[in-house]
Amino acid sequence: MKAVVTRVRSASVVVDDSVVGSIPDSDVGGLLVLIGVATGDTSATARAMAEKLARLRIFEGSTADGRPTEVSALDVDAPMLVVSQFTLMGDTSHGRRPSWSAAAKPAEAEPIFNACVEELRDRGLSVDTGVFGAYMAVESVNDGPFTVLVDIPSGDRS
């Protein structure tokens, strides 16, 4: 399972001219997370990804004595907008056309994607999503910009 995680000031996803998920503009902002599910990913992979995303220390904070520190979405109650994106699994190492062979088929990927979203919610995070498999327009106002890649190998339980 792969994720592109972007710290944003605001973000939204639109399907058929309707906003289906968003992160409102705020001082804290949130995380726009694009997730690709790989063949072989399991609920354990989804759980490991959710734990990593929830505790990834990429927000600015400060200690009680005012020293700067990095804090997680959990620490600052930052909302997430999580969007499925099978193209993250594209392999461009050969030729000019991406291969999608590493991407899980939709029937396999959707329950794993949903499990990751539920794991995030179970940790107390506010999570909006796009519509799995739909054509979506995603808009964001990046903060920083600050974007990281998270890769949890299939079956990883760490």
Curated annotation (Swiss-Prot):
Catalytic activity annotation: glycyl-tRNA(Ala) + H2O = tRNA(Ala) + glycine + H(+); a D-aminoacyl-tRNA + H2O = a tRNA + a D-alpha-amino acid + H(+)
Listed Pfam families: Tyr_Deacylase
Alphabetical GO biological process terms: D-amino acid catabolic process
Coarse class of the protein's main subcellular location: cytoplasm
Motif, Gly-cisPro motif, important for rejection of L-amino acids: chain positions: 144-145
EC number: 3.1.1.96
Top enzyme class: hydrolase
GO MF annotation list: D-tyrosyl-tRNA(Tyr) deacylase activity; Gly-tRNA(Ala) deacylase activity; Ser(Gly)-tRNA(Ala) hydrolase activity; tRNA binding
GO cellular component, as recorded: cytoplasm
Compartments where located: Cytoplasm
Entry keyword set: Cytoplasm, Hydrolase, RNA-binding, tRNA-binding
Assembly behavior: Homodimer.
Role played: An aminoacyl-tRNA editing enzyme that deacylates mischarged D-aminoacyl-tRNAs. Also deacylates mischarged glycyl-tRNA(Ala), protecting cells against glycine mischarging by AlaRS. Acts via tRNA-based rather than protein-based catalysis; rejects L-amino acids rather than detecting D-amino acids in the active site. By recycling D-aminoacyl-tRNA to D-amino acids and free tRNA molecules, this enzyme counteracts the toxicity associated with the formation of D-aminoacyl-tRNA entities in vivo and helps enforce protein L-homochirality.
NCBIfam families linked to this entry: D-aminoacyl-tRNA deacylase (TIGR00256)
Protein name stated in the entry: D-aminoacyl-tRNA deacylase
Organism name: Corynebacterium kroppenstedtii (strain DSM 44385 / JCM 11950 / CIP 105744 / CCUG 35717)
